[in-house]
Amino acid sequence: MTANKRILVVTGGHRVALDDFLGAIAEICHDRGWVWAHATQPTAQAWLNPAHAGCWDAILLHDIPGLSLARGSEPIALPPGPGVAEALVGLLDSGQGVVVLHHAIAAWPAWEGWAEAIGGRFNYRPARLRGEDLPSSGYRMGAFTVEVADSLHPICAGIKDFAIDDELYFAPVLTDRVTPILTHDADMSGELFQDTFDVVTNGLSTGVTCAGHKADGGLHGGHRLMGWTTTAGISPVATLLMGDGPSTFANPMFRILLGNALDWVSSTHAKNKAAAQPFAVPLP
């Protein structure tokens, strides 16, 4: 662990218990001797630019840009504005470490390349990915055990299997793009998951679930992953799917995981590994 790291935390586009979340960030950074700053979308997007490469050791994304959400209305996928995707790809091509947290996997649904960059996507509405038409994703709250899949990975240092009460996703993951580090033991039966498009569009659930989805543990959902790593450009990226609310933010194991993830994506080892295995992120 290296002291004096600089962390940028990005939120916006989705509700979050901000005081609890930022309180957890403050304590994580204080314990590790780091400094941090908070930016909100859409103005935060200006930081996600190669012109600012090197300003931050790690960027934590807990936001959903590219999506218009309002209960009682259909969620609308918005393409990146002029130069936005190019700036993001340029930042990733500079070796910027990134951590994607929870609902941030729903970002930029109109840009397939972003799903490739982070290893998956939560679809608020039916969408197309890798040449397939996919249904909207699902969610449910539940108590489950987070399980360590790679005990040797630095993100899992000091982590043992732990119980948590958080939001689970029934959503695509690109299994050929990710290296699993965490799994979970929750029941992933599609009928347990509320259809997100139904809930958002109607303002509440009308009973539509993910039953009947072609669950395959990958593109069609149903996977048990809770965390993974990947490379985008020459940047190390870590994704943690937990992170819905105050009980998770207060969980000691979650705090260790998040701190470890920020530490790892900003490490020389992770950056060298990513540079040795680059991935060209497709532009829109």
Placement of each model-derived feature along the sequence:
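Helical hinge/lid and interdomain linker segments adjacent to catalytic or ligand-binding clefts
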Residues: 6-9, 18-100, 104-108
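Short strand->helix junction
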Residues: 14-15, 247
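Conserved beta-strand segments of alpha/beta enzyme cores
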Residues: 33-37, 179, 236
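A glycine-rich, often tryptophan-bearing local segment used as a flexible ligand/cofactor-contacting loop or short
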Residues: 66-158
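Hydrophobic/aromatic beta-strand patches that form the interior of the parallel beta-sheet core
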Residues: 8, 99, 179-181, 238-240
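Catalytic beta-strand/loop cores that center a nucleophilic Ser/Cys/Thr
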Residues: 120, 127, 132-233
